[in-house]
């Protein structure tokens, strides 16, 4: 899980979602693409 100021989709399987006012990126193909804004 990377904590970044601006989250971006890395591949086409990445999805941007909001959970409890936190913007996250989840990826079904590569777990290393997981990100959180903060």
From Swiss-Prot:
- What domain of life does the UniProt record list for this protein's source? Bacteria
One GO molecular-function annotation for this sequence?
Answer: structural constituent of ribosome
Give the matching Pfam families. Ribosomal_L36
Q: Does the keyword section mention Ribosomal protein?
A: yes
Q: Which PROSITE patterns match?
A: RIBOSOMAL_L36 (PS00828)
**Matching InterPro entries:** Ribosomal_bL36, Ribosomal_bL36_sp
GO CC annotation terms, alphabetical: cytoplasm; ribonucleoprotein complex; ribosome
GO BP term (any one): translation
Keywords attached to this Swiss-Prot or TrEMBL record, sorted alphabetically, are: Ribonucleoprotein, Ribosomal protein
Of which family is this protein a member? Belongs to the bacterial ribosomal protein bL36 family.
Q: What HAMAP family is this protein classified in? A: Ribosomal_bL36
The name this protein carries in UniProt is Large ribosomal subunit protein bL36
Natural source organism? Polynucleobacter necessarius subsp. necessarius (strain STIR1)
Gene label? rpmJ
């Amino acid at each position: 899980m990377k904590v970044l100021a601006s989250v971006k989709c890395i591949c086409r399987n990445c999805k941007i979602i909001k959970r409890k006012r936190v913007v996250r990126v989840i990826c079904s193909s590569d777990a290393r693409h997981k990100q959180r804004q903060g």
